Amino acid sequence: MAVTRRLLISLGLVAGLALALSACDAAKPSAYKAIDITGAEYAQDLGLPDTEGRVRHIAEFKGRLVVVFFGFTQCPDVCPTTMLELAEVKKAMGADGQKVQGVFVSIDPERDTPEVLKAYVANFSPDFVALRGSLDETKATAKRFKVFYAKVPGKTEGSYTMDHTAGSYVFDTSGKVRLFTRYGTGAEALKHDLQLLLKQG
């Protein structure tokens, strides 16, 4: 997946907002490996249907840490790597792994049918949830999360891939958005942050 200027700008905006939120406490280093966005006014809820047609909200996962990633099933690298790392972290956390909920939001509803999405997330963990809205719903949700995505023409006529923000949002057990973890941070860093959030309650 090509990293475009717009994608870098999108990541920069998230990082910039995180810095603004922590400006009043700049002297105290963050305990997290990811970007601490506690108190952010964006990324508040999902409100998209799952593969069974049930509309899902962050609030229903109360008591669990929720890791939300926007991607597409035909993504060759970032998406499967991100989901695999999350599955590995969930397993490595043992009993605490049951308190981690992975949510995959499709940015390509034209190709990602409910059947395709259901099979895709099941490859990583039977507990993971996949969400798929209409084109308009997807656009609106991505905007609420400050997630950038766009079609990129493929090598053959009519084909395309997707360019998108490469990172996940982490919600604490009370349903509040807390972290933005960039792609490439690694499984160990994610495990550290999830365990810390659970410890904090």
Please annotate each region the language model reported.
Residues 67-68, 102, 168:
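Hydrophobic beta-strand anchors of alpha/beta hydrolase catalytic cores
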Residues 46-66:
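A short beta-strand-turn-helix
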